[in-house]
Amino acid sequence: MIKVLIADDQELMRQSLQIILGMEKDIEVMGTVANGLEVIRAVRKEKPDVILMDIRMPEMDGVVCTQIIKENYPDIRVIVLTTFDDDEYVFNALKYGASGYLLKGISAKELAEAIRKVYHGTAMINEDIASKVLKLFSRMAQVNLAIQVDEEHAAEFRPTEWNIITLVGRG
């Protein structure tokens, strides 16, 4: 049985997810909570295998909560389930160790399958989010790209040549 904790500030969402996931033979919803602080308290009592985590919640948001959970309980998998797909949320959630980032438009069948895959060690990212992630990492790679330069030859370049090199480097 895969033990799941649902964290969402909207009661209707918590109840709906609990009903939907409760129909799965291999998934047990061990509890529902409304914010990140309640997640921490719930995890201290009984460790879930997977946490379905909303991003925007009162008291403590899903990104900060994900960071704390992964630092203290690295074996617990976190799937961010949210309506928000802005770059900062996506980047930070994945940076702090979320195993999945899914948008709430996902079907019940897809969500159950995502929980199973994440439980078994696979990362799950919504297709639209995957495109954003690739673009983000591409931009990061370009910014952090460093090359080795022969200092002796580089000292001979004129200012105009440096200008051309800089422009070529920027693409």
Question: For the regions a protein language model found, what residue spans apply to each?
Answer:
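Active-site residues of response regulator receiver
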Residues: 8, 54, 82
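Short hydrophobic/Thr-rich beta-strand motif most characteristic of the beta2 strand and flanking loop
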Residues: 26-34, 42
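Active-site T/S-Asp motif of two-component receiver
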Residues: 53-54, 65
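Short, flexible helix-to-coil linker/hinge segments that flank and couple to helix-turn-helix
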Residues: 89-95, 105-154, 163
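Receiver (REC) domain active-site loop signature in two-component systems and cognate sites
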Residues: 57
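Acidic catalytic/metal-coordinating carboxylates
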Residues: 35-38, 61-64
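Active-site beta3 strand of CheY-like receiver
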Residues: 46-52
